Amino acid sequence: MAYFMIRRLNFNRYNYCSWRRCLNFLYLWGVIIEGAVVHEKIMRTILLLMAVAFCCVGQNAVAMVDTLRVCQYDSVQLTQDTTDILCGEGDSSWYGGQLGLVLSGGGARGLAHIGVLRALDEMGVRPDYITGTSMGAVIGGLYAMGYTGEQISQLNREADWNELLSRTIDMRKVAFDQKSSFSRSVFSIGLRGKRFRFKLGYIEGQNLWDFFFRLTWPAVKVQRFDSLAIPFRCCAGDVLRGECCVLDSGSLAVAMRASMSVPGVFTPVVTRDRRVYVDGGVCDNLPIDAALAMGADRVIGVNVSTQNAYEYNPTFGLRRILNNSAMYFGIRKAQEDLQRCDVAIEPNLEGMTSSTFSSGREIEQRGYLAALAQREEIMRLAQRMGRKVGVGAPCGFDTRRLLDSVAIDSIVVELESLPLRRFALNASQLKAPSKITQANMQRASDNLIGSGYFTHCIYYVDEQRRLHLLPQPAPRFVMSFAANVNDAWGASAIVRMRMLNPFSNVSRLDVAAMVTAQPKLDASYTTYVSPRMKAFVRFDLDYTSEKLPYYVNNQNVASVWKHGVGAQGFIGYMPMLSLTMDLGARYSFVSQVPNKEYNTWVGLKSLGKYRQQSLRLFFDVRCNTLTRPYFPERGQSVVASVAYLFNSPLQSYSSAGKEEAKQKVQSDLDKPHQFYSINFRYRGTFSLWSAVYLEPSLVLGLNSRTTGRFSSYLIGGGCFTVRDEFSDVPFYGIGYRQLSASDVWGAAFDARIRLWKELFFVTRVNYAQLNDTMAGLFRSFTNPKVGLLGGGAAVAWMTPLGPMAVSASLANQAQKVWFNFSLGYTF
């Protein structure tokens, strides 16, 4: 009992020899006392004298610098002290003292640390201090909180690392008015200061932020890592100051994220004191010095980074060159530091790289086997330190604490701009004083990020019960770029621009242009009129130029060029991120120009132009809970619209031709003067198994009067060829926009199978009924004017350039196999 009270005191590493003699002396007394039957008063007296002796010896102890989040230490002095001790004591049977556990970085290879922790739990060996870098910081931080090795193993089995480490976030967290442009670019540049700059990393890592904040929620009020179940430190590199920093306080989630910010891959973590942290592996990949500075006397080191790091192999490529260059100093230092460990564990990770998270379970098992292989050495070290080993795993972390509520008295938003502070506070929808849970904070973070004004949000609760929100503002001006090529309209380049607060606070200007033979241009201005961003007013301007195909016997023989200019304004209300209701009006001016081939088919002798104006009053309800814009894993999308249209008469500028030919043109191009329409679209994605998804969809389009051939619903086309939300109805088995109808209803059923990561095999069966009138559509379910049944198969792949799909399809009306190809993000 005496010994176990003493060993929790902090040792002065700079007077280590004196401490060692005193410790051995006191330990012997502790053993004698524990083995004897002594009166309680005598025991108290002896312990008091021992404590006084300790205080006298340690008067000159050097205190550890503990300001901010960075702990400094003299690495050279610690190295010399450790060398003297290890060499001077020889084979001493008694060590005593504190045990440190040091976990290296290594990306996915770092999952081997979980297996090591499981083995240590089984042996009953519990460290007094933990330090880690990169993935070692993540796993070590969770273990320091109180998670057991088995619980962390469970997290590893349940975690979707591909999603956590992806550059896209769950689309359900994006405000509805921004979903249409969300995650549709290959790269982007932002205006920071007065210069355009690329992002500081390929992955913002918001999914990882959310993951860390959720798991560390019980420690949200912890400001010093010494207050954790096991004192903890992690390393990160400050690229501005050129320093290797040991993080010992602040937000545990932020420290873990900072320590694994691989340069170029993850964006660095920028703190309030203007420090810019990157992966600690660039400077100290095996932080043994940090463990010694905390007071560790003996160290168990687990290294997963240096094995075969600099051995040549035929697959050596650019990626490995960049990784080894960035981590060169840290890896070299880790090789040297490994020799200073009392027990060094190096799992056999041959064939595993820093990115093979798909093999997480195997990597973990290799770490477990490596620790078991050194079981005797670990147990011997623990016994020499006076540990009771072999008592089994510790009590598990109570996961119910993840649901704990925390009382707050006030909310502090740490932003320089007063309007932005108010906006962030309102958007978070948090109130104080109140009790908050992690779910409340997750929802607040989603609201802030989904607004588009912030890239991520850090938070913590201080000792005065103040909730601090540190949202990272997004660049005020961003340009993003993408490309697209398909068989419907050819190749195109897509440029998007977004400006925040261009004319007033809490507003946004979006401009998107598709540069192609059939161009499109959209510009919208949105301003929020409610404190919590639920109500907004939006104005749109758009231009489109497209070719409407004219088919005869399944052949595209002619076309009509359609040029349109439109303007609309509406009031929107978003009760939640995935739902919006819009009420507004739209004006459009359309000019249609048939080509020579079209005039030949209908009997006109000269070219002509046909113009028409229209006014549309509409009310739309939209809901979208899909997880991704392309190949989602779950969710549903619903669009319901009711509209009333007023059209001007079709103005003809054709100079010659038979009267019946002009009538044909009018029936193709004209719209009725007044009518109403109802549109409904549904799409769902349901996960049947881990790699199989079922996707039913429905479409319903009704007009109260018969419309022209090119003024109604256009049916046909493969994947990703929709240019107009309501008029285009994709259908497997016929050509792009091959058929048209005044009214249509249809259903499709897709089965999507994940073959490998983002590679899918898709099969589709679809059916549609087409009619000229709304009444005719309802009366002709058994005998429609046109009944289409088709289907096909496609291979789809989510590439860095956007979704790619190659499909083949057939329908009962077409009597031919249609092949379609598409690559790139859609407009």
Language-model features, listed with the residues they occupy:
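Flexible glycine-/small-residue-rich
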Residues: 236-238, 347, 413-417, 471-475, ...
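Bacterial Sec-dependent N-terminal signal peptides
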Residues: 1-5, 18-73, 698, 702
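Gram-negative/organellar outer-membrane beta-barrel architecture
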Residues: 438-439, 458-626, 630, 719-729, ...
